[in-house]
Structures are given as C-alpha cells and as structure tokens.
UniProtKB/Swiss-Prot annotation:
Record lineage: Eukaryota, Metazoa, Chordata, Craniata, Vertebrata
Domain of life: Eukaryota
Protein name: Leishmanolysin-like peptidase
Cofactor dependency: Zn(2+)
Catalytic site: E265
Length: 647
C-alpha cells in the first residue's frame, strides 16, 4: 500500500473535509496518459514538458557537525516497545520571524504543522522517559570523555553558540558547559547550569529560513539533517530543516510540492540517511554494525561517514541487458535490513530478492541516500520529485529497521462486551477494533501477536482480525447498531439519520455533515436527582466541529469548547432534556479539519466548578426539611386567623 503524500491537507469552513489518507495499490505509475478533450483545436500545438525537479542532494553532516552519545536526563529510552506516536517539537529560528508576513504565515501556520502532523501519525517510537538536553559544541571541535562519565569535556572552551546545521540552538535547550584545561581530573562544569531542555518530545526540529551558501549554489527549496544523537540507541534527537527564503512560494498550486519536499527532508533527519546506516539496530536493540570501545562504529574517511556493515548495506553485481544482445556487469548497493527485505520481496513478488536497491546516480547526496528511481519512480524517498509522491511500505520498513521508529499496522484491542470504541483512521466514524478469538489457531503466516493484554501466550495463535480477506489483520472498523436483528443506525458521524435517540444519547453526541469522531477520555455520565446513568460502550463519539481564527472548536449542544492544542482534555458539562451530561473529550489536531490554524498553546486555566440552576425534580433532603419547617411555622398563624374570623 502507499499513503497519499501531498494531498488531503486540510479544509476550510465549519466542518471537516475529505480524508487526509488515500490508499493505492501501486508504488509507481507505469505509464503517462495525456488526455486532451473538450478543447477547441488551434493552429499551433502546445508544448508539453515532461521533466523532474532537481535531484535531492541530502548533505550527510560531517563528523564535526554531529554530536554523538548525548546524555539525556533520566532513562530516556524504555527497553520495551510501547505503541506511542512520535512527538516532534518544532522550534522556529528568528530568520523565520523575519520573513515577509505571507511567507512566515505559510511556514509556521500551514507548511510545517501539516508536515509534522503527518509524520507524527505515521511513526511510533520507543517511549522516552526524560527531557532532551543537548550537548554544547566545543570552540576547537576538540573534546575528551572520562570513563564512567556520560558527558564530554571541551578542551579549552565551549563554543559561544551551539548550532544545529545553520540554526543556532537556544540556550535553554543546552547542557552546562564542561571543559578540560589540562592536568588531572576532575574538571568541572562552568558557566550557566543545565537549562530547562525539551520535555514531552522525541525529536527536536529547528526550522530556519536562512539564505545559506547551499541556497545560492543549488536550486533547492529546503534541506535537512540530524545534528545530535542520544547515547543509548544512537537515535537522532535533534535535527534541522532550512528553507531557502527565495524559493518559498505562496502560490496555492505550489503548496503540495513544497509539502512533499518538507516531509521528504524531515525523514532524512529522522533516519533515512547514509550517515546513519552504521547506527541502525535490530529489533532487540543490538547494533547491526560492530563498535569500538568508545561505542562508535569505524569511520570511513573517503566517504566522510561512519562505515556500515553488510548487515545493513551490501554491494552486489547484476547481469545487465544492453543493446546488441550484450550482457554487462552492473554494480548496485542494496539495503538489506530484515523488514526492508521482507517488504521488497512482497512488493516485487520475488522471494529471493536480497534487498532494496539504493540510488547509484545523481552525485554526492543523491547516491545511497535514496531509493533507486528506476524501480520506485514516484515513491516519497526517491531522489527527485516527478509526480504525486507516495510513501510506501518499503520506506516505512526502513524506518522501523532503524531500531527507533516503529509502525503499528493493526489495532490490538479485543472486541468484547462492552465495546471499547475508537475512531476510524479518517476520524469520520466511530469504530471498534475487529480483533477476535477464533475457534481454532490461525495459519502461521497470519499469527501477528507476540503478546496481548490479558491473553495467555498459548492462546495467541487463536487471535486475529475478523476480516479474512484482510489477512486476518485487525483494524478499526465502522459498524452498525441492531435491535432484535433489525438495523437501527450506522456509526458514520456525517449522516444526520444516525443521531441516537434522546434518552440513549449519553455522550451528548451530534451527528451531521459537520461532525467528526472524537476520543472520549472518560465515560459520560447522565445525572438527574439521585439517578446516575452511564453507557457501558464508550471510548469515542460524534461531535460537531468548526474552524475559527482562534483554532478548532468542538460543539456540544450549543456550547463551544476551544481546542488550543492536540491532546488537550475538554471537560464537558451541559444540560440536555432535563439531565446533566458530564464527560471529557480529547482534542484532535486542528490541522486534521481546518485549512488555517494558529500555533498550539497551553489552554487557559478554567474554573471547572459546576453552577447549575435548581431542578424542579430535586430530591435534596435539605430542601424538603426547609419546606416542612415553613409549613409548620405558617400553621399557627393560619389557625389564629381563622379563629378570629369565627368569633
């Protein structure tokens, strides 16, 4: 499968637009058809140019530009795999702030938010448990390391500024300067102590708009790379993306191309780089390339990068058919990591294929850093943009083989009673994971799970998705409600007729053309007098959303709730049909549904104390006592008044 790379980017208006995802069955286009119809013939023909953008020359950063073995606070990498989405913290350089207003708005409020949102949803990581605090560069690029000390010590002085590519790293993201000035250890830290760092992030991306030498000599929109790697798994934790200011276009027709370019470049920084091949790990966390005592692989000075082993990249010779019925030898480099081999064999239906071929043309930066264009044409990580870039399973496999980014191709929540509801991938319908237990073990090739929560290991072969033609791969699936065998409604949020009955609408949901599926953080509760009701099937629901200059708004009844950032918890408390509905919703990304969104911020503090008017059906004991006391005090007065009249 291939995920749409450039389209489906966000929509204006009060409701959601089309899905951000589209799937196609092929990674490349086999032919080009020029369809000419409905046009008046002219005396002259219109020339058609079939070309490609200039090749991507990914600059593998030099040894002096990258800091390895960066010590992070706490145990930054958890050894077990946890299904959590990649979190990228975007930090904009002052050069972005100095762009023309329309370019600045495009970069900060549309281009990078959409690209980052896409990548965060696509990749998962081993969850970190600490704060990213980057190492300082040294003034002379010379440093020492002490045994059993995770820090590095600059010989002489630390650099006045630490850079990530061309972008200066903010001081608050840096560790304290540590120096060695000769003599005996210990030598200590000097200057400003450790700063705050970056919490709740797996990767920090510094975005600049600097007119660098590369911008003046190469016809490029942007370029990106990594700059610091953590000590445990050699994972890039910081990188940069620089936009050439003169190449930033605000023309709507050029946005899709720029968006696909930014995604392509950020993937280079995350792991698809020849400079990182030697740092790939296997599924157990072991390096695929042997290391020296200092923890680093051998350095290849002729290539200017760390030398990978043949467990990652292998050189092979092909027999090459050319003209005059001749066969020549053709040397290629194959990426041979396990998941890449598996996906390449599936894609080309070739069970003996050794790996996926890397590009061998285009010069330094294009060669070895991309897939072979001849084989994967418009795949996202080929070396030039020709048409409609798509991200294939082969690139996803490579990112998983880095040992850091992982993919979760299926859901793992058992379908049971009560149901644990979720959202369909496009967030347009309530869904349920169709994972179930079968009466007999599934065929070996369809047994996907090494573990499932609450399921004994000996029972795992019995579990898979309910749809056989999907290879028993469980996925979140739309469903319908039935009563006594009769169809009632479906879970598609956009269909008004799916609106639940008033007294069954526990979550205060609203179905209609402007509604989307939102995750419920907690089960909704209906309260009235001393009665409390909740529905056992919960986890998601349909709610109306709208776009505003302030951001995405979620509507429950006639009350709007502003989403300041994705993942924000919205405490909901509304009155509907004489009942109080209480619950919590999770905010989606504004970019999932809106064309323009403001920068994400922390929500303002709110007073969550509920002030409700008195309900006529109230069963408050204090109110009952008060009424009886009032009647008791009035009775003697009334009796005296009647006696006076009698006499």
């Amino acid at each position: 499968m291939a995920a749409e790379w450039g389209g489906g980017v966000g929509y204006s208006g009060s409701g959601p637009g089309r899905s951000r995802w589209r799937w196609s069955g092929s990674v490349w286009v086999r032919s080009v058809l020029l369809l000419l119809g409905g046009l008046r013939a002219s005396a002259t023909s219109t020339p058609v140019s079939l070309g490609s953008s200039p090749p991507c020359r990914h600059h593998v950063p030099s040894d002096t530009e990258v800091i390895n073995k960066v010590h992070l606070k706490a145990n930054h990498v958890v050894k077990r795999d946890v299904d959590e989405h990649l979190r990228i913290k975007t930090v904009y350089d002052k050069s972005v702030e100095e762009l023309l207003p329309e370019k600045k708005n495009l970069v900060k409020n549309k281009l990078f938010p959409q690209a980052i949102s896409y990548l965060e949803k696509t990749f998962q990581v081993r969850r970190p448990a600490g704060t990213i605090l980057l190492s300082r560069q040294c003034a002379t690029n010379q440093y020492l390391r002490k045994e059993n000390d995770p820090h590095r010590y600059c010989t002489g002085e630390c650099a006045a500024h630490t850079k990530c590519g061309p972008v200066i790293v903010p001081e608050e993201h840096l560790q304290q300067c540590r120096v060695y000035r000769g003599g005996k250890w210990p030598h200590g830290a000097v200057g400003v102590p450790d700063q705050e760092g970056i919490s709740d992030a797996d990767f920090v991306l510094y975005v600049g708009a600097l007119a660098t030498e590369r911008c003046s000599h190469e016809n490029i929109i942007s370029y990106a790379a990594y700059c610091q790697q953590e000590a445990n798994m050699d994972r890039p934790i910081a990188g940069y993306a620089n936009l050439c200011p003169n190449m930033i276009s605000t023309q709507p027709q050029e946005f899709v191309g720029m968006l696909s370019t930014v995604k392509h470049e950020v993937i280079h920084a995350l792991g698809f780089s020849a400079g990182l091949f030697a740092f790939y790990h296997d599924k157990d966390g072991n390096p695929l390339t042997s290391r020296f005592a200092d923890g680093l692989p051998p350095f290849n000075y002729s290539l200017g990068l760390y030398q990978w082993s043949d467990k990652v990249v292998r050189k092979v010779e092909r027999l090459w058919d050319v003209r005059d019925n001749k066969i020549v030898r053709h040397t290629v480099y194959l990426l041979v990591t396990p998941r890449v081999v598996e996906e390449a064999r599936k894609h080309f239906d070739c069970p003996v294929l050794e790996g996926m071929e890397l590009e061998n043309q285009g010069g330094v930066g294009t060669e070895l850093n991309h897939w072979e264009k001849r084989l994967l044409e418009n795949e996202a990580m080929t070396g030039s943009h020709t048409q409609n870039r798509v991200l294939s399973r082969i690139t996803l496999a490579l990112m998983e083989d880095t040992g850091r980014q992982m993919l979760s191709p299926y859901c793992d929540t058992l379908r049971s009673n009560p149901l644990q509801l979720t959202c369909r991938q496009d967030q347009r319908a309530v869904a349920v994971c169709n994972l179930q237990k079968f009466p007999k073990p599934l065929p070996q090739e369809y047994q996907y799970f090494d573990e499932l929560s609450g399921i004994p290991a000996e029972d795992l072969p019995y579990y898979g998705g309910s749809v056989e033609i999907a290879d028993y791969c469980p996925f979140s699936q739309e469903f319908s409600w039935h009563l006594s065998g009769e169809y009632q409604r479906s879970s598609d949020c956009r269909i008004l007729e799916n609106q639940p009955e008033i007294f069954k609408n526990y979550g205060a949901e609203k179905y209609g053309p402007h509604s989307v599926c939102l995750i419920q953080k907690s089960a909704f509760v209906m309260e009235k007098c001393e009665r409390k009701l909740s529905y056992p099937d919960w986890g998601s629901g349909c709610y109306q959303v709208s776009c505003s200059p302030q951001g995405l708004k979620v509507w429950v009844q006639d009350t709007s709730y502003l989403c300041s950032r994705a993942g924000q918890v919205l405490p909901v408390s509304i009155q509907m049909n004489g009942w109080i509905h209480d619950g919590n919703l999770l905010c989606p990304s504004c970019w999932d549904f809106c064309e323009l969104c403001p920068p994400e911020t922390d929500p303002p503090a709110t007073n969550l104390t509920r002030a409700l008017p008195l309900d006529l059906c109230s069963c408050s004991s204090s109110l009952v006592v008060t009424l009886w006391l009032l009647l008791g005090n009035l009775f003697p007065l009334l009796a005296g008044f009647l006696l006076c009249i009698w006499h």
